[in-house]
Amino acid sequence: MTEFKAGSAKKGATLFKTRCLQCHTVEKGGPHKVGPNLHGIFGRHSGQAEGYSYTDANIKKNVLWDENNMSEYLTNPKKYIPGTKMAFGGLKKEKDRNDLITYLKKACE
């Protein structure tokens, strides 16, 4: 696993719009969609967004989200949390993950 390196929030926003927005929101108080609202995700344990129905796998994983484990998760979500209902296949390019996480850090705080 490689260490997270801050990327381009602008490129990350574009990635979010094309790869994530169909299932997630980021604004405070935003609705859950197919996936949970991601506001406040960094520093929160997996499976803990209030009002969202997670799989047991997400709850039991109990990972405290930070930039590094988020990058590992986004590489291959179903490998990182077997049993997750996240259908997204992952972002294979480290640069894309860094850009997306940089955007999420700003958009979700």
From Swiss-Prot:
Heme c binds at C20, C23, H24, M86. One of its GO terms (molecular function) is heme binding. Pfam families: Cytochrom_C. The keyword Heme applies. The modification N6,N6,N6-trimethyllysine is found at K78, K79. The keyword Kinase does not apply. Keywords: Electron transport, Heme, Iron, Metal-binding, Methylation, Mitochondrion, Respiratory chain, Transport. Methylation may enhance its transport into mitochondria. Methylation occurs in fungi, plants, and some protozoa, but not in animals. The precise role of methylation at Lys-79 is unknown, but it seems to preclude pro-apoptotic activity, possibly by lowering affinity for APAF1. GO terms for biological process: mitochondrial electron transport, cytochrome c to oxygen; mitochondrial electron transport, ubiquinol to cytochrome c. Induction: By oxygen at the level of transcription. Expression drops rapidly when the oxygen concentration falls below 0.5 uM O(2). One of its GO terms (cellular component) is mitochondrial intermembrane space. Binds 1 heme c group covalently per subunit. It is found in: Mitochondrion intermembrane space. Its main location: mitochondrion. SUPFAM superfamilies: Cytochrome c. Its cofactor is heme c. Present with 7330 molecules/cell in log phase SD medium. Belongs to the cytochrome c family. Electron carrier protein. The oxidized form of the cytochrome c heme group can accept an electron from the heme group of the cytochrome c1 subunit of ubiquinol-cytochrome c oxidoreductase. Cytochrome c then transfers this electron to the dinuclear copper A center (CU(A)) of the COX2 subunit of cytochrome oxidase, the final protein carrier in the mitochondrial electron-transport chain. Isoform 1 (CYC1) is the predominant cytochrome c during aerobic/normoxic growth. This is Cytochrome c isoform 1. The gene is CYC1.
